[in-house]
Design a protein with these regions (language model features):
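Phosphate-/nucleic-acid-contacting segments
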Residues: 152-222
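Short, well-ordered alpha-helical scaffold segment located
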Residues: 70-71, 103, 172, 211
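Residues that scaffold the ATP/ADP-binding catalytic core of kinase and kinase-like folds
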Residues: 52, 74-75, 106-107, 148, ...
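Cyclic nucleotide-binding regulatory module and flanking cytosolic helices
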Residues: 1-30, 71-72, 76-79, 110
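Polybasic "coupling" helices that flank or enter modular domains
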Residues: 109-178
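Cyclic nucleotide-binding regulatory domains
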Residues: 24, 29-92
C-alpha cells in the first residue's frame, strides 16, 4: 500500500474516537462474513488476514492474503448498500483498527487528500488481482506456488535461520494458487527436497536465499 495512505490512516483515523483497535485477534477469528453488509473498513496493524470466496457448490478460493499496513473491507467505500464479497479471517495473531463507514466519510470530507490516497490504494489492489489472474491463467502449479510463497514472505519477518514462517496449511495454499490439495502437496514435497521450503503442521517456512541461488543456477524461481 502507498506510504502516503498508510501515514494518513495512522494520522487521521487510528486515533479517532469512533475507531476501535482490536488487539490480539486469534487465528480463525472472523472480521466479516461473505454477504454481510459492508459498513466497516479494517486497517491491519499486525498479523495476516485472508479473504476467502465460497461459491454455491462449496468451492473455495483465497482471493488474497493481507499483512501489516494494508486494508480489508474496501466494499465499504462504495456508495449505497453493498455487501462483503468474501470472508475475512485471521491467519496469524492480529491487531486491526475497525473504521466505521460513517466515520471514514466524515474524515474524508474534512481531509480530501485521504480520498485521493484511497483511490490510489484501490488502483494498486486492482493491479494485484490482475496479476493474480495472470499467474493463475498462464503459469504451471509449481511456478504459482513459488510466486505466492515469495509474495507472502514479504509480509512476515524472517526467523533466526533466515526462513520466512508462513502460518498456512497446504489446503490454504492450494486455495490460494488455484490447485488441488494433492497437487499442491506433491509440489511442496518436491520444493522441500530442494531446500526451498520446510513443511510443518499449519506452517510453511520459505527460504528465499536458497530459492534465489537456485534461480541463478537455472532452476525455477519467479
Amino acid at each position: 500500500m502507498h506510504h502516503e495512505l498508510t501515514s494518513l490512516l495512522k494520522k487521521l483515523l487510528c486515533s479517532h474516537k469512533d475507531v476501535s483497535r482490536l488487539p490480539a485477534l486469534l487465528r480463525t477469528s472472523c472480521l466479516f462474513g461473505q454477504g454481510e453488509k459492508a459498513d466497516t473498513l479494517y486497517f491491519i496493524e499486525e498479523g495476516l488476514i485472508k479473504l476467502t470466496r465460497t461459491n454455491d457448490l462449496g468451492g473455495r478460493v483465497i482471493l488474497a492474503v493481507y499483512g501489516p499496513n494494508e486494508l480489508v473491507g474496501e466494499e465499504s467505500l462504495s456508495a449505497g448498500k453493498h455487501f462483503y464479497f468474501a470472508e475475512a479471517e485471521v491467519l496469524s495473531p492480529a491487531t486491526v483498527y475497525k473504521i466505521p463507514g460513517a466515520t471514514l466519510e466524515s474524515v474524508k470530507s474534512a481531509h480530501p487528500e485521504l480520498g485521493v490516497a484511497l483511490v490510489r490504494g484501490l488502483v494498486d489492489s486492482n493491479l494485484g488481482f490482475a496479476q493474480k489472474l495472470e499467474w493463475l491463467s498462464l503459469h504451471d502449479v509449481e511456478s504459482r506456488v513459488l510466486y505466492y510463497l515469495e509474495q507472502l514472505a514479504k509480509l512476515v519477518e524472517p526467523a533466526e535461520d533466515q526462513g520466512y514462517p508462513l502460518p498456512l496449511t497446504q489446503l490454504e495454499l492450494a486455495d490460494l494458487v488455484g490447485a488441488t490439495r494433492e497437487t499442491t502437496s506433491t509440489t511442496l514435497n518436491s520444493l522441500e527436497k530442494r531446500g526451498f521450503v520446510k513443511l510443518s503442521r499449519r506452517l510453511l517456512t520459505v527460504y528465499l536465499r536458497q530459492g534465489k541461488a537456485a534461480a541463478a543456477g537455472g532452476e525455477n524461481w519467479p
